[in-house]
Swiss-Prot record:
NCBIfam families: atpA, PRK13343.1. Belongs to the ATPase alpha/beta chains family. It comes from Polaromonas sp. (strain JS666 / ATCC BAA-500). ATP binds at residues 174-181. The gene is atpA. Keywords: ATP synthesis, ATP-binding, Cell inner membrane, Cell membrane, CF(1), Hydrogen ion transport, Ion transport, Membrane, Nucleotide-binding, Translocase, Transport. Its EC number is 7.1.2.2. GO terms for cellular component: plasma membrane; proton-transporting ATP synthase complex. It is found in: Cell inner membrane. GO terms for molecular function: ADP binding; ATP binding; proton-transporting ATP synthase activity, rotational mechanism. This is ATP synthase subunit alpha. Produces ATP from ADP in the presence of a proton gradient across the membrane. The alpha chain is a regulatory subunit.
Length: 517
C-alpha cells in the first residue's frame, strides 16, 4: 500500500492539532539523605517556608508528605509527616505549592483525628466541606474585643477565685499527677448546652490515657460538641509539633463565624520537647536547655490565636452572613513542671504569654484537696471583668479567708494558746478549704455554686463539723432543688441576686440547717 506524501502530511497535521499537552511545571529535587524522619533535599530552589513537599508513596499507595523547615543555600531540610522508612537517597521530591491544611467544620465534632485531621476512631471517613491552613496570623488589636463574658468551668475554686472569660488564655500548670487534665476535662464537660464547641489536643500522651479521656467525654455526653486531636507518644516528633496548630485551626473555624470555642492543649511541654527534637535533627543551634532560639515564638504564635473578636471582624469574615455576633476561642494550655520549678525555660515563657495561671500543687493533691489549686499564686489577669455578677458578689471573701488561713495556720503550729478571733479564722479557713474540694466529672451549676458560697459567707457552716461540710453542701443542693426550684431557676437565669432572692435564699438555707442538725 502506497501513501501519498500529501496524505501523510495531512495525517500528521491532524494528529498534531488533536494533541493536548498539559504542561505541569513543578519544582523538583532529589533526596540526599534520610535520618530520623529528617530528609535533606538538593534542588527545590523555589520552595516556601512551611510548604508541603510530596515524597514517593508507600508500598500500599498512601501519599507521603513533608514540611520544608530549613531553607539553605544549596539544600532544603524537611521533616516527614508519617512513615519515612520507604524513602531512599536519590528519590524525587516535588513542591506542591501549598501550605499544610487540615479539614475544619462541624463535621469533625464527636470525632478523634490525628494531627493531619485524618480520622483514627474507626467511625469511617469525615466528609468535611472545608480545609484551612494550620499556620495563621492571629487577629490584630483592632479586630479584638475585650473579654467580658464568663466561661464557667463548673469548679468552685476556679469560678470563684480565678475566673476564666471567653477569649482568655488561662494556663494550667503543675507537676505530673496533680490533676491538670482533670481540671481541663471538667471545663469541657461543663460546656454542655452552653453553645461552646470544644477541641482537646493530646500531645505526646500514652494512647491509653487518650482513650480514657475520650471514654470520660463520651460518658458525660460531651463528645457531641468536642473534637479530639491526638498525637500520641508513639507518633513522630513532627506530628506532635504540628498537632497543636491543627487543633487551633479547627477551633478558629467556630471563632471566625461568631461562635464560641474552647481549646485545651495537653500539654505544651511535650510539644516544646518535640520541636526541640526536630530542631536539633535539622542542626539548628541549641540555646537554653537545648531548646532552639524560637521556642518562645513557637508558643506565642499559637496562643495569640485564642482571642475574642468583634462584630465587624465576624461580619467581614463571613461576608455579611453573620451580623452582630462576636466570636471567641478560649485556650487552656497545660504545662508540666519538674519538682514545682516554674522558673524553668518553657514554664516562664508560657506564663508570660498567657492571661493568668492556675497552679496545682502536689502537696495539696496528696493532702486530699482536689482540685489541688494553690489560691495564693493562681491568678486570672482578665477574668475578673468576665466573672458572673452573682458569683463575683459572693466570692469576694473566699480568697481573703484562705489567704489569712494559710498565714495563721503556719503561725498556729508554734503557738499553744490562740485568742478567740484567731481560732474563728482558722475554723472558717478549714471549712472553706474543705468546701472547695470537688469530685471529678461533677461540675456545678451557677445557682448551686451561689448557694454554697452564700451559705459559707453568711456563717451557716461555722458550727458544722469540717468532715461534714461536703455532706452539708450536697444536702443543701438537694433541698433547694426539691423545695425552692423556682428560686434556683431564677438565680440560674438572671445570674444576679436581688434583695428578695437573697431573703428567700437565707430563709431556705436556715430551714435546711435546722433539718440537717
Amino acid at each position: 500500500m502506497q501513501l501519498n506524501p500529501a496524505e501523510i502530511s495531512e495525517l500528521i497535521k491532524s494528529r498534531i492539532e488533536g494533541l493536548t499537552v498539559s504542561a505541569d511545571i513543578r519544582n523538583q529535587g532529589t533526596v540526599v539523605s534520610v535520618t530520623d524522619g529528617i530528609v535533606r533535599i538538593h534542588g527545590l530552589s523555589d520552595v516556601m517556608q512551611g510548604e508541603m513537599l510530596e515524597f514517593p508513596a508507600t508500598a500500599d499507595g498512601t501519599p507521603t508528605y513533608g514540611l520544608a523547615l530549613n531553607l539553605e543555600r544549596d539544600s532544603v531540610g524537611s521533616v516527614i509527616l508519617g512513615e519515612y522508612e520507604h524513602i531512599a537517597e536519590g528519590d524525587t521530591v516535588k513542591c506542591t505549592g501549598r501550605i499544610l491544611e487540615v479539614p475544619v467544620g462541624p463535621e469533625l465534632l464527636g470525632r478523634v483525628v490525628n494531627a493531619l485531621g485524618q480520622p483514627i476512631d474507626g467511625k469511617g471517613p469525615i466528609n468535611a466541606k472545608m480545609t484551612d491552613v494550620i499556620e495563621k496570623v492571629a487577629p490584630g488589636v483592632i479586630a479584638r474585643k475585650s473579654v467580658d463574658q464568663p466561661l464557667q468551668t463548673g469548679l468552685k475554686s476556679i469560678d470563684s477565685m480565678v475566673p476564666v472569660g471567653r477569649g482568655q488564655r488561662e494556663l494550667i500548670i503543675g507537676d505530673r499527677q496533680t490533676g491538670k487534665t482533670a481540671v481541663a476535662i471538667d471545663a469541657i464537660i461543663n460546656q454542655k448546652g452552653k453553645g461552646v464547641s470544644c477541641v482537646y489536643v493530646a500531645i505526646g500522651q500514652k494512647a491509653s490515657s487518650i482513650k480514657n479521656v475520650v471514654r470520660s467525654l463520651e460518658q458525660a455526653g460531651a463528645m457531641e460538641y468536642t473534637i479530639v486531636v491526638a498525637a500520641s507518644a508513639s507518633e513522630s516528633a513532627a506530628m506532635q509539633y504540628v498537632s497543636a496548630y491543627s487543633g487551633c485551626t479547627m477551633g478558629e473555624y467556630f471563632r471566625d463565624r461568631g461562635e464560641d470555642a474552647l481549646i485545651v492543649y495537653d500539654d505544651l511541654s511535650k510539644q516544646a520537647v518535640a520541636y526541640r527534637q526536630v530542631s536539633l535533627l535539622l542542626r539548628r543551634p541549641p540555646g537554653r536547655e537545648a531548646y532552639p532560639g524560637d521556642v518562645f515564638y513557637l508558643h506565642s504564635r499559637l496562643l495569640e490565636r485564642a482571642a475574642r473578636v468583634n462584630e465587624k471582624y465576624v461580619e467581614d469574615f463571613t461576608k455579611g452572613a453573620v451580623k452582630g455576633k462576636t466570636g471567641s476561642l478560649t485556650a487552656l494550655p497545660i504545662i508540666e513542671t519538674q519538682a514545682g520549678d516554674v522558673s524553668a525555660f518553657v514554664p516562664t515563657n508560657v506564663i508570660s504569654i498567657t492571661d493568668g495561671q492556675i497552679f496545682l500543687e502536689t502537696s495539696l493533691f496528696n493532702a486530699g484537696i482536689r482540685p489541688a489549686i494553690n489560691a495564693g499564686i493562681s491568678v486570672s489577669r482578665v477574668g475578673g471583668a468576665a466573672q458572673t455578677k452573682l458569683i463575683k458578689n459572693l466570692s469576694g471573701g473566699i480568697r481573703t479567708d484562705l489567704a489569712q488561713y494559710r498565714e495563721l495556720a503556719a503561725f498556729a503550729q508554734f503557738a499553744s494558746d490562740l485568742d478567740e478571733a484567731t481560732r474563728k479564722q482558722l475554723d472558717r479557713g478549714a471549712r472553706v478549704t474543705e468546701l472547695l474540694k470537688q469530685a471529678q466529672y461533677s461540675p456545678l451549676s451557677i445557682s448551686n455554686m451561689a448557694a454554697t458560697l452564700f451559705a459559707v459567707n453568711k456563717g451557716f457552716m461555722d458550727d458544722v463539723e469540717v468532715k461534714k461540710v461536703l455532706a452539708f453542701e450536697h444536702g443543701l443542693h438537694a433541698w433547694l432543688k426539691d423545695k425552692n426550684a423556682a428560686l434556683m431557676a431564677k438565680l440560674e437565669a438572671n445570674k444576679a441576686m436581688d434583695k428578695d432572692a437573697e431573703a428567700e435564699l437565707n430563709t431556705a438555707v436556715a430551714a435546711f440547717k435546722k433539718a440537717f442538725a
